[in-house]
Amino acid sequence: MATDNPRAVDDQETHPKDRLNRVVFYVSALIILIFSLTTILFNDFANRALNQVLDWVSSTFSWYYLLAATLYMVFVIFIACSRYGNIKLGPKHSKPEFSLLSWSAMLFSAGIGIDLMFFSVAEPLSHYMHPPVGEGQTYEAARQGMVWTLFHYGLTGWCMYALIGMALGYFSYRYNLPLTIRSALYPIFGKKINGPIGHSVDTAAVIGTIFGIATTCGIGVVQLNYGLHVLFDLPENLWVQTALILVAVIITIISVTSGVNKGLRILSEVNIYVSVGLMLFILFLGNTEFLLNALVQNVGDYLSRFPSLALESFAFDQPKEWMNSWTLFFWAWWVAWSPFVGLFLARISRGRTIREFVSGTLIIPLLFTLTWLSIFGNSALHNVIFDGNIALAETVLSNPAHGFYDLLAQYPWFPFIAGVATITGLLFYVTSADSGALVLGNFTTQFTNIDHDAPRWLSVFWAVAIGLLTLAMLMTNGITALQNATIIMGLPFSFVMFLVMAGLYKSLRLEDYRQASASLNAAPVVGNVDILNWKKRLTRVMHHPGTFETKRMLNEICRPAVHAVAEELQKRAVQVDVLEVPLEEDEELYHLDITIHLEEEQNFIYQIWPVRYIAPNFSERGKRGKQFYYRLETYLYEGSQGNDLVGYTKEQVINDILDRYERHMTFLHINRISPGNRPLFPDPKA
């Protein structure tokens, strides 16, 4: 049996095959196709239209982006620090799929990308030359430049990823809902998420995600183009950039159709080590003492100035162009990427508590990101301020993609290091496109199993769509067009994120009601109940039954008990289903499920699962050389109850079912009478 809740309703025999979500797919594809073709065919018109819409969005919603980003952060930290932080992303009996070290390594990889190579030099130098307020080319401008860079890549953005990852993991692994954004809205809209509301939400997620990925790929293409120019004297133009996009699309198609994606994952892991090596190279071959002092100062400045930066709208200074190019762009970019990275974070975090998840997401990748930005950013600033290389800063202002390579040119073995940086950037670029195609395919598929991936042809389509959109943006106005489009396209999903917060909080409140109902004593049982005497109890504790005895217990005790309860409820006009599903690991055994339907409220599900464990050496079964034994464990909707029915009588099994049912009814009652609450619950068979 798997470590997570083994439910009959999850068995593939009871479900249809995965299928395309036609509405989300066709609407998203049509919007992207129209946008891309219009941009490619009518360059000037598209550029003017983007600028006009951007002016409207920035003048109308700049305050909103700042406030929204801060509220996302406050919500995530509040949930993690509250009592809800103990709730697991999955049933309460679930265990993490990955060890702490492996999980940390995967979180670490989430913090690395080609955009870090681009902005680690370009942003600090841009702010140093032209800060949003105050005089440029001063020590204060240098400090501001690093603080703004850390702020744009800091806690606020990672909280957006954590919010979506937390919601996806909670609703998918605890409530068995699809691994899509609409699932988080079930507590608000109920089954309406299967209609236009859900389609709109998922479409907004797809549109935002593909623009976020296209922006990253576009930035990567421009930077790689310059890297190839440095190494092989290739020209910097749209033709070379188009060829790079085509190469990425082809590699992605090969990856998703031939199974070499495992090889790409290995390469991306190697890439992490190479990236760390590149960072250490700059640290130890540069002015190490200065860089370490600057790192400590940067962290201190970031922490001390963070409260004022979080809501800094420059209401009086009004550097509109600066806001559009930096803070608004970054917040929209984080919003656009949040479904993509959130899905990745959710998938690797099943079985962890919300507090563990948020802590890991906010600390591990953030530490690396801040260290990378500080080392490269301060190296560039040191080269400009103390070595007098003002040309580096001027180059960044005119061609930001040149900054990273021009900084590397100041160090020994430049051709070799530039080659390593180019290969690293290319792999980051390809893996972003590859992962993006997979995630977009998942968002446009209706799965019968949340662990499935989208069909290959769908991932191929999205790989081509990412390439087409990236090319369209580069043809319009390069990186500026990508930034402008991200600010615009990230806006709709930013509203969805507030609905995600509301749905998640509403569902977490139900955990309080469930806990309260579980703590209440069931009604006293009247009559002569055969309570296990101490000798029977001792025999039961020491017993480790095999397949034969477990099957006998199921057939002679558990099955009659379950059917007795079902028949009595059916006499009272209650809809009840009983299922017997063979185990995959031992077809002689089966698990028993009884589902009591409660109309619009959450159904009561009680399951009896034979769970196989390794027989302990001290047991009689272990001494006889038998490898396994079984426990008859009970599962409710929220997961394992931790008990074992082996040795129970029929009446005791019936009493256990009724105790759990009564507590469930108490839970529904508490939820029903709570102020302002509507009892909308996920349908486990949906």
UniProtKB/Swiss-Prot annotation:
Q: Membrane side Periplasmic: which residues?
A: 44-60, 122-150, 225-237, 287-325, 378-412, 481-484
**Major localization class:** membrane
Q: Name one GO molecular function term.
A: transmembrane transporter activity
Write out the GO cellular component annotations: plasma membrane
State the compartments where it is located: Cell inner membrane
Family stated for the protein in its record? Belongs to the BCCT transporter (TC 2.A.15) family.
What is this protein's function per UniProt?
Answer: Uptake of choline in the presence of high salinity. May primarily serve for osmoprotection.
Q: What is this protein called?
A: Osmo-dependent choline transporter BetT2
The gene name reads betT2
